Swiss-Prot record:
Job description of the protein: Formation of pseudouridine at positions 38, 39 and 40 in the anticodon stem and loop of transfer RNAs.
InterPro entries (alphabetical): PsdUridine_synth_cat_dom_sf, PsdUridine_synth_TruA, PsdUridine_synth_TruA_a/b_dom, PsdUridine_synth_TruA_C, TruA/RsuA/RluB/E/F_N
Keyword terms of this UniProt record: Isomerase, tRNA processing
Keyword Isomerase among UniProt keywords: yes
Record-listed E.C. numbers: 5.4.99.12
NCBIfam families cross-referenced by the UniProt entry: hisT_truA
Full protein name: tRNA pseudouridine synthase A
Assembly behavior: Homodimer.
Gene3D superfamilies: Pseudouridine synthase I, catalytic domain, C-terminal subdomain, Pseudouridine synthase I, catalytic domain, N-terminal subdomain
Amino acid sequence: MRVALGIEYDGSQYFGWQRQAEVDTVQERLEKALSIVANEPIAVHCAGRTDAGVHATGQVVHFETNAIRKETAWTLGVNVNLPDNIAVRWVKVVDDEFHARFTATARRYRYMIYNHQLRPGILRSGVSHYPGDIDESKMHQAAQYLLGEQDFTSFRAVHCQSNTPFRCVHEVNVTRQGMYICVDIKANAFLHHMVRNIVGSLLEVGLGNQSVEWIEQLLALKDRNKAAATAKPNGLYLVDVTYPESYQLPKLSLGPLFMLD
């Protein structure tokens, strides 16, 4: 039987999603909890492997199991065995053709900026603090150059293992709610560090250090060294993964919780 789960986690205490030797990861914690409930070893596959310090409100995973359990066992039962900063949000038995990564048609991330002179105390691991006068309208204007299928070499990590730098950005918006600025971006897929590298460069525009057209120029240059530094990890959230409607997966609010959808 193949089961899909919606997962939420605070990634600030983990060395990323993917299981690694001798460090604490979200995947390892989730697999341990699932294995307890299933009474057999469970291995999960995820929609997107988040880096150290990155969060998720809309991560999707799937796994195979011989165990027959009620839905509450895969939600409440698994949550009892998880640390407080990881939670199952929903469960659904899916067809064998479903794959959390390969049947996904799009991913959506939100990057949360706390724009204030003083750093936050609460939410310090859930937002990235950037002081100074940030013009979010210029960031939004510059971000529109990212739309469509393009070569994102200037915004990929140096050690990115993808075979191609081309990705298709479906939509991107930069909005403000008081002291919070949200960079909301949806694409068919993302390169390693792509969102954080984009945000780092958009911030240069918002702070007035670069022109709106600079983003267009960076895309044309296809050179990571010409773009800005990578933005901090703690403001980044994987908020949604899109699948064909035929799978009828649950739809929940995107989050993070302090955002008004």
